[in-house]
């Protein structure tokens, strides 16, 4: 296990998917003096509880772009790092049982299409074929998003950690941060 350095440009507290993703993305931007401190082992907190659903159609354009980026990243991460992520893309559908909800879904689809998320309206019959256990007799519309998927949060976190470490980040497990040091209202250090 690496020892905790005296200094680092960036210290990330927490080795779940969010903390490790931050380290991964910082190192992709060539900020490599990054240390991730995890009090237990990577993914030991809430990450391992997550369902890992990757749905790209969100309520705003910014969130839709972020979700689409995540889907692309998850597709490429295993090839980049050699670490399996469990990512698969069975697709998803959004359904509406009233006209107001159907109009909301269609507006979202127009926005998603504008940022490159593939989606298309499908008939109620096609929705029933794709998802035979779903009740469809009360539906007024259905939208199919073929690249939506699911990933293994634990495996994806490990792949992100491997990618971050390959670019220079340090990941240290079994080190608890007990205090944040502040100066003039800013965090300037941690106590372990």
Q: What kind of feature is each model-predicted range?
A:
Residues 4-18, 35:
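Beta1/beta-strand and adjacent pyrophosphate-binding region of the FAD-binding site
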Residues 23, 27, 163-165:
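Gly/Ala-rich phosphate-binding loop of Rossmann-like dinucleotide-binding domains
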Residues 38, 123, 173-175:
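Short loop/edge segments at beta-strand edges and connector loops
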Residues 52-130:
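Dinucleotide-binding Rossmann-like beta1-alpha1 core, especially the glycine-rich loop
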Residues 100, 131-139, 181-188:
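A short, glycine/Asx- and small/polar-enriched loop/turn
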Residues 143-192:
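Helical element adjacent to the flavin cofactor pocket in flavoenzyme catalytic cores
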């Amino acid at each position: 296990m690496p020892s905790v350095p005296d200094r680092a440009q960036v210290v990330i507290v927490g080795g779940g998917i969010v903390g490790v993703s931050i380290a991964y993305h910082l190192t992709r931007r060539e900020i490599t003096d990054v240390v991730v401190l995890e009090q237990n082992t990577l993914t030991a907190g809430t990450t391992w509880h997550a369902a890992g659903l990757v749905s790209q159609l969100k309520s705003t354009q910014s969130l839709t772009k972020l979700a689409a980026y995540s889907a692309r990243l998850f597709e490429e991460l295993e090839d980049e790092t050699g670490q399996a992520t469990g990512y698969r893309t069975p697709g998803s559908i959004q359904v509406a049982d009233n006209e107001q909800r159907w109009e909301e879904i269609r507006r979202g689809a127009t926005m998603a299409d504008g940022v490159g998320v593939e989606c298309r309206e499908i008939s109620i019959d096609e929705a029933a074929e794709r998802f035979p256990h779903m009740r469809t007799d009360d539906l007024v519309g259905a939208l199919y998003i073929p690249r939506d998927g699911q990933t293994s949060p634990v495996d994806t976190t490990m792949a992100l950690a491997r990618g971050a470490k390959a670019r220079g980040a340090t990941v240290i497990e079994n080190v608890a941060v007990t205090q944040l040091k502040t100066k003039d209202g800013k965090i300037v250090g941690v106590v372990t």
